[in-house]
Amino acid sequence: MTHAPIGIFDSGVGGLTVARAIMDQLPGEALRYVGDTANAPYGPRPLADIRARTLAITDSLVAEGVKMLVIACNSASAACLRDARERYDVPVVEVVLPAVRRAVATTRNGRVGVIGTQATITSRAYDDAFTAAPGVTLSTAACPRFADFVERGITSGRQVLGLAQAYLDPLQQADVDTLVLGCTHYPLLTGVLQLAMGDHVTLVSSAEETAKDVLRVLTEHDLLAEADGEPAHEFRATGSGESFAKLARRFLGPSLAADAIDPLAVSSSSA
């Protein structure tokens, strides 16, 4: 079981930021990644639809024999994290709490902002997570178009900057000094987001902290792979493999082979 892959799921390409962090911190672990690009972005979808899509794909990953699941999508974590942990015998790691812990440790004035998809913000997953952090004042803002821009490979330019300034203005007015990127797509917008918020604001991505959680949980369950060679990774998408591969190279580097990306058909029905 220790040599079984880690299963990673995201609505599209954003979870590749988490995959990259895991590859960097745990180079001996094999990854099996599925991006539901045919149905991205998840943000505008009802939580029930997100739950059904997520569990359909995570069911398939567990059936393939992964030793751990990483739900590398904030919207999916908000929709069905509890369901997934009750449903599967393998450990399930998510991306919300790691980002919250980092933000609490980072803020200097106690004012933290969170941006995410409409589904993530509506779910109040971050509001609930921050309740255990006394002294933190939380401000949130939905950024419904960001994930779609990233999925289309548009991560800079005047249009994206203007959108960011409009979305983030309430958080600037709230004087936040720490901004949680509550969607794994958003690290590709770091340049635009930093410009819109100013250098005095620290941006927090969950990717690095999630990778630390993966290491901790694998260690606790005695599931760490032995470093005995180059692990085999698989990256798949429910939509166009070619489009996915092009965007994936921005996260994982130009050496990612296009033939490593296979189309995946997954039923959206789930119990």
From Swiss-Prot:
HAMAP family: Glu_racemase (MF_00258). It is an enzyme of class 5 (isomerase). Gene3D superfamilies: 3.40.50.1860. Belongs to the aspartate/glutamate racemases family. Substrate binds at residues 10-11, 42-43, 74-75, 184-185. GO terms for molecular function: glutamate racemase activity. The active site is at residues 73, 183. This is Glutamate racemase. It catalyses: L-glutamate = D-glutamate. InterPro entries: Asp/Glu/hydantoin_racemase, Asp/Glu_race, Asp/Glu_racemase_AS_1, Asp/Glu_racemase_AS_2, Glu_race. Provides the (R)-glutamate required for cell wall biosynthesis. Its EC number is 5.1.1.3. GO terms for biological process: cell wall organization; peptidoglycan biosynthetic process; regulation of cell shape. It comes from Saccharopolyspora erythraea (strain ATCC 11635 / DSM 40517 / JCM 4748 / NBRC 13426 / NCIMB 8594 / NRRL 2338). Keywords: Cell shape, Cell wall biogenesis/degradation, Isomerase, Peptidoglycan synthesis. Pathway: Cell wall biogenesis; peptidoglycan biosynthesis. Pfam families: Asp_Glu_race (PF01177).
